[in-house]
Amino acid sequence: MKFLYSDTQDYVDPEYNFTTDRNAPGRRRYWDDVYAHELMAPTPYDGLLVAMSAVRSAPGVATSKVRYSTSEEQRLLRDGVRKFLRFDGPKYKEAMMMGDCGSFAYVEQEKPAYDALEVFEFYADACFTHGVSPDHIIFACDVDNPPREAMGAEVLYRYDLTLENAREFMRICESEGFPFEPMGAVQGWSPQSIAEAAVTMEKMGYRYLAIGGLVPLKVEVIHQVLKTLREHIKVETKIHLLGFAKADSIQEFTGYGITSFDSTSPLIRAFMDEKANYYMPNGKGGLDYYAAIRIPQATENPRLMQGIKRGIFNPEDLQRRETRALAALRQFDQGSQGIEPTVEAIMDYQQFATLSGDDEKIGKNLIKVRQRLERTLTETPWKNCDCDVCAKVGVEVIIFRSANRNRRRGFHNLGIYHQHVQRILEKSR
């Protein structure tokens, strides 16, 4: 079971100055930056996935901060996706380089943003090893398996269109000599309809199926989908789970013969989760999660800046508290200060970033923040990690502040998660 990371142009400045919070002088975005697989050894994933919607704009495709520029798209197609992502060379020769359409980006549109020929040409030109047929997401999944006649026109349209696209995509792949391994995108409104679509795609010639629409589903529903799917398709047919948001529960799904799955969850949680920002193995076959220590930049954090503009906060006072909080944490890390004064210095600044709602809500939020902070400082997980990120930057990895720290923490999470998946596989053999 291979773990693929879905690329969102996540790279960091290897020479970033954490003391001044500045990039290296003359640093050029991308060219001087490094991806997780360049910063860490071993590589923190088994392959990469790139969504066409992140690379190529089209009518109806939602805009994104991680959208490739026109010049980046041209370079990717000219040099190939492996070279562009610097995921080339003998080390990555056998690693999956998978493409999909990024159907979330056009989910509100009547039809997919790209047709089968456009998608094929994108995969072939960029030299992907695997490519998913264009699909249209169906979000609902009813485990009661309602019949086709009970479904609305929109659901049936998306279901039938996804199958039609898969048929045309396979026809093109066959006529062009299969420059990559085609993967059939499977959608459905129930476990039974998903299984039936999968069987239809097997008959088209697909030997690798990519199961979509899983993101909003609960774990027990995904179990039902995979159980029904495996009861219908051939034993040798490979399964990929698209955008598997339940990555922390992957150990529950080893019995379904899953070949691969992709997820951004370990990296995204580094800066999007309220309390699970830093991963560590718990020694019992699972993972522990720690809250990062939030010390935002006083003159760049949106909430603090809003308070400054409204005259609620004094910028000089905020910066003094910010400086004290950072100094206290670094002194604690060096062993020259205890937990309690460190907590007080950080909370003295944190209270301003927590201001929202009424006094009672603020008070409850601050109590939770303090409890998470005390746990993180008591257990000092960054001191117990020997990954390349933690070994080099130390306590900076646990500070929730600036993209260069937060992404590094995400890289650490990818490495810990990849090792977690490998341990699960070893136990299941």
Regions found by a protein language model. Name each.
Residues 89-91, 176, 233, 379:
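A generic structural signal for short, solvent-exposed coil/turn residues
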Residues 1-174, 333-370, 429:
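Non-catalytic, usually N-terminal nucleic-acid engagement modules in DNA/RNA processing proteins
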Residues 275-429:
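C-terminal accessory extensions appended to soluble enzyme cores
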Residues 55-56, 103-105, 136-139, 189-191, ...:
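Short, solvent-exposed loop/turn segments at secondary-structure junctions
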Residues 154-169, 193, 410-421:
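Charged, low-complexity, helix-prone segments enriched in Lys/Glu/Asp/Gln
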Residues 2, 176-344:
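Glycine-rich phosphate/ribose-binding loops and adjacent secondary-structure elements
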